[in-house]
């Protein structure tokens, strides 16, 4: 059954690819080079997932290693429709920071994957772009927590650290905005493969839409709160899709990660989701679904 699902998904992707010329595909740039996670293993998956959709031409910009000359790191953001950050490391040069801000503010797309929301804790505009972040010196001074309580998202301004997680485990993701193009047509809830469940993220949380949450269970070291998992943020004329999922290569092979990442990157690039198909191996509430 899983093999059939993969074949059908590939057939849809090939059909989409056949219908688009190279000039019509979105140009995506994945940024990596430093991370406290295994970016050398996860960037190829992020590239593959986009390429498999048939909708993207993907390039990679790799920064110098820690301690290297960051002044020389000058990705050409403007040559692309969307930038995917798999980066969590040393500060970029002021010129490169300004180039990303200008790119997104002028209508470009940005995708934040997992630990990319740990980066640049002191960079004010980055924190506005990503909405919420963790670690990097973040605290109540960075902005509120967002929690889903009593049927709505609330802003919790209580004092405390920014960013934590319990033990890796499989958990249920619950859609909170089923009308958004990224989540439209997906099940209202599903099981995600074992992953870090980020909690206590905080930040400016301006122009933000929480698409999905997960319960951070105290039994696994969590907060006892329903925490944001999938977010969108409007920044100037640009669009940001922020997924807190994807700690490991295994987590990035979870079908729900693949589908929401593909959809979120389409939306960030264009404001639309061109391929809103739901593969037959998309997980339900009973167990995760992982592709090999």
Indicate residue ranges for each PLM-predicted region.
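Bacterial N-terminal signal peptides
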Residues: 5-17
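Helical hinge/lid and interdomain linker segments adjacent to catalytic or ligand-binding clefts
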Residues: 23-120
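A glycine-rich, often tryptophan-bearing local segment used as a flexible ligand/cofactor-contacting loop or short
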Residues: 90-181
């Amino acid at each position: 059954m899983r093999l059939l699902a993969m074949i059908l998904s590939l057939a849809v992707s090939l059909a989409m690819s056949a219908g688009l010329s190279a000039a019509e595909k979105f140009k995506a740039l994945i940024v990596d080079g430093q991370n406290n996670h295994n970016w050398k293993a996860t960037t190829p998956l992020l590239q593959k997932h986009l390429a498999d959709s048939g909708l993207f031409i993907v390039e990679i910009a790799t920064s110098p290693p820690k301690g290297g000359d960051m002044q020389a790191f000058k990705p050409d953001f403007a040559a692309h429709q969307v930038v995917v950050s798999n980066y969590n490391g040393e500060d970029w040069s002021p010129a490169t920071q300004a180039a990303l801000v200008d790119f997104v503010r002028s209508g470009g797309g940005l995708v934040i994957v997992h630990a990319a929301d740990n980066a640049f804790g002191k960079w004010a505009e980055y924190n506005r772009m990503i909405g919420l972040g963790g670690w990097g010196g973040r605290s109540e001074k960075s902005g509120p927590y967002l929690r889903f309580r009593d049927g709505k998202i609330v802003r919790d301004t209580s004092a405390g650290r920014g960013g934590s997680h319990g033990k890796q485990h499989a958990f249920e993701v619950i859609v909170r905005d089923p009308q958004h193009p990224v989540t439209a047509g997906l099940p209202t809830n599903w099981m995600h493969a074992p992953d870090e469940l980020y909690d206590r993220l905080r930040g400016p949380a301006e122009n933000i839409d929480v698409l999905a949450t997960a319960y951070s269970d105290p039994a696994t070291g969590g907060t006892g709160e329903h925490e944001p998992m999938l977010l969108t943020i409007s920044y100037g004329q640009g669009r940001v899709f922020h997924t807190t999922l994807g700690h490991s290569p295994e987590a990035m092979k979870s079908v729900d990660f693949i589908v929401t990442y593909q959809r979120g990157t389409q939306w960030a690039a264009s404001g639309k989701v061109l391929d809103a198909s739901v593969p037959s191996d998309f997980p339900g509430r009973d167990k995760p679904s992982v592709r090999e």
